Amino acid sequence: MRHTSRITFLVAGLLATTGVLAHHSAVAEYDLDKPVSISGTIKRVEWQNPHIWYYLDVKEKDGGLSEWGVSGGAPGQLMRRGITKDVLQVGAVVSVEGFRARDGSKNMTGRRVTFADGRDVFTAGPEQQR
């Protein structure tokens, strides 16, 4: 009986780990072979776990505005690199390089953010540092 309990516990642990790894896989959500670059104005910032999100108003070719969601690394990871929530200010004009969502939505994982004054920061998590 004790042996069966250990095996059950081991299998349950392995299954739980698979879900966690799938959630944190950039490859699952974003096409890392298709880089994208957008420019716009930061509309809002959500600085919370497990990943920060910031949203840009992006001017389309037809003159209209569309909202793009940009996923970044975890707040703790970013703060260890000196990037605080004060860096991404609402109203700032930025260009963002990253990878578009696989589902074709106007979401992306942001890697490099370049500000109008030429400063840039790397907002992606460590899994995207390639």
Task: Briefly describe each language-model feature range.
Residues M1-F9:
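Bacterial N-terminal signal peptides that target proteins for export
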Residues A22-V36:
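Short boundary/loop segments of OB/S1/cold-shock single-stranded nucleic-acid-binding domains
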Residues K34-P50:
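Structural detector for short beta-strands of small beta-barrel domains
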Residues Q48-V58:
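Short aromatic-glycine-enriched beta-strand elements
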Residues G72-R80:
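Short, structured beta-strand/loop micro-motifs enriched in basic residues and often containing a Trp
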Residues R80-V96:
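Short nucleic-acid-contacting surface segments enriched for D/E, G, S/T with interspersed K/R
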Residues A101-G125:
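OB-fold/S1-family single-stranded nucleic acid-binding modules
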